[in-house]
Amino acid sequence: AALVQKALEEKLGFALALTRGEGRKGDVILEQCPQMGKEDYILTVDAENVRITGGEAGVWYGCQTLQQMVEQCGAVLPVVKIEDGPDIPNRGFYHDVTRGRVPKLSFLKKMADRMAYYKMNQLQLYIEHTFLFRDFSEIWRDDTPLTAEEIMELDQYCLERGIELVPSLSCFGHLYKVLSSKGYSHLCELEGADQMPFSLRGRMHHHTINVTDPESLEFIKGKIREFMPLFTSRQFNICADETFDLGKGKSRAAA
């Protein structure tokens, strides 16, 4: 309610007081209905008040619709009844924070605000090396990585806006920055990974981890152990895609 109060104040120029109990004439009334779907809501505007009734997340989504109405109509809203709910349960955005500039926490929060406004409910940040792994400093030391504290703060920020922040960590293919480093190049499927000239195509098509080396699994598990506890999500995206070199080098005999 406080988040909605602040958003409406920015659009209307005056603050609506928060309280609990029975609604009165002129109030914006928010009420949960356990019988409704979790993300469903009904928004009604009549001569008496504005009422948003919905499931646990539905009330929040109804508030986003109310904000959009205020942007269009100002303080004088039309009489209306809106019944709404999603057809798609997971409405997410996948954002690459590895190839290119690493965004600041303030930017990621603005992204979460915009996602909430459009009733999106899942955010994944694609990471190869742009997290400050305490045990693997060699892979991020030339960058400005996201920290554990920033991830936890963003996770809480997303939760408050109905967004699940899902960890997404590259664990198999195109580990360019990792497998071109001196300390970990021996884990690459192809020989001489640290000597390959940089190219965008090469970055995507090579630098697959060698699955036949037991050290590879321990390295990946170590990254996951450090990264996973920072999130409240029960999901984890290991990004095991685009392993173009698999079976073409050190693992050829096992392929």
Regions found by a protein language model. Give the residues of each.
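Contiguous, structured surface segment used for ligand recognition
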Residues: A1-R91
